[in-house]
Amino acid sequence: MKIAIVNDMPMAVEALRRALAFDPSHEVVWVATNGAEAVKYCAELTPDLILMDLIMPVMDGVEATRRIMAESPCAIVIVTVDRQQNVHRVFEAMGHGALDVVDTPALGAGNAQEAAAPLLRKILNIGWLIGQRGSRVRSAPQPLRSGAPRQSLVAIGSSAGGPAALEVLLKGLPKDFAAAIVLVQHVDQVFAAGMAEWLSSASGLEVRLAREGEPPQSGKVLLAGTNHHIRLLKNGTLAYTAEPVNEIYRPSIDVFFESVASFWNGDAVGVLLTGMGRDGAQGLKLMRDQGYLTIAQDQNSSAVYGMPKAAAAIGAASEIRPLDKIAPRLLEIFAK
């Protein structure tokens, strides 16, 4: 994979170079010391992946991410020395299209390969996404066997650009919205709680992490909160699971949508928002095949038109709508 590094700290650049050297398939194609340089270099030679710092002179990583995704789009992972201190900047960058975030590997760590492992795992996952490898063949959902009372559910999946898209969508819904909402966003579990808090603050709705064994409930907004998949069980409750292991990116939107298609006992709408790759497209198709309404975000309003495009290509979306029209549509569907 051709990788670029954007960081103004020589020690951080060296730490990243050493970490990448553990995988000979990775090649550093250029290094920029600030965001403005990165925008320029990316236009001249667009890499497969950029490892982007947040705080830099001239232009920071948030603005650089915005510019690059608008002008020379490619996969971007935020690499920072203190994720928790920079949580709001991280979500800003993800709103502009960054895919993930990871700590800068420690230079001179006792076990250098172990220190590099989290970064290399992220890069492996990103490679799977940008490669857009074919999805596994999925069987049709099993007949509904849930004895849970009938309710309404909105199942939402998002990836690159998702935080900002979710903010817009949730802002358009009232606090007494008539359906349960479950969000599956590609975000590391370290950041899931922070993202729930950020979405709560930004949208005005109460957003919290989904708990093992709880059912979706009307008026509640639940966010998948671990690096395992989240799925609906036939008794109507939510569960985290490591299976299927062949779904590399976790949590998988496909896994959740498929479980809704199989086991949800009530009205439901599937919504697939901005994101890179194909995750969610097949699951959305299964929801549509089961008679549920499905919505994909349109190209013009998507930060990254990958997942919604894949859904549109296979006929998974009943409707394709601009982001700002999705919440009004949900209000129409679930009007009290």
Curated annotation (Swiss-Prot):
Active site, per annotation: S159, H186, D279
Gene3D superfamilies in alphabetical order: 3.40.50.2300, Methylesterase CheB, C-terminal domain (3.40.50.180)
SMART domains: REC (SM00448)
A GO CC term attached to the entry: cytoplasm
Span of domain Response regulatory: 2-119
Catalytic activity reported: [protein]-L-glutamate 5-O-methyl ester + H2O = L-glutamyl-[protein] + methanol + H(+); L-glutaminyl-[protein] + H2O = L-glutamyl-[protein] + NH4(+)
Cited CDD domains: CheB_Rec, REC_CheB-like
Gene Ontology terms for molecular function: phosphorelay response regulator activity; protein-glutamate methylesterase activity; protein-glutamine glutaminase activity
Keyword DNA damage in record: no
SUPFAM superfamilies the UniProt entry points to: CheY-like, Methylesterase CheB, C-terminal domain
Any single GO BP term: chemotaxis
EC number: 3.1.1.61, 3.5.1.44
Residue ranges annotated for the CheB-type methylesterase domain, each copy included: 143-336
Family indicated by similarity: Belongs to the CheB family.
Function: Involved in chemotaxis. Part of a chemotaxis signal transduction system that modulates chemotaxis in response to various stimuli. Catalyzes the demethylation of specific methylglutamate residues introduced into the chemoreceptors (methyl-accepting chemotaxis proteins or MCP) by CheR. Also mediates the irreversible deamidation of specific glutamine residues to glutamic acid.
PANTHER family in alphabetical order: PROTEIN-GLUTAMATE METHYLESTERASE/PROTEIN-GLUTAMINE GLUTAMINASE (PTHR42872), PROTEIN-GLUTAMATE METHYLESTERASE_PROTEIN-GLUTAMINE GLUTAMINASE (PTHR42872:SF6)
Note on domains (UniProt): Contains a C-terminal catalytic domain, and an N-terminal region which modulates catalytic activity.
Name of this chain's protein: Protein-glutamate methylesterase/protein-glutamine glutaminase 1
This protein's encoding gene: cheB1
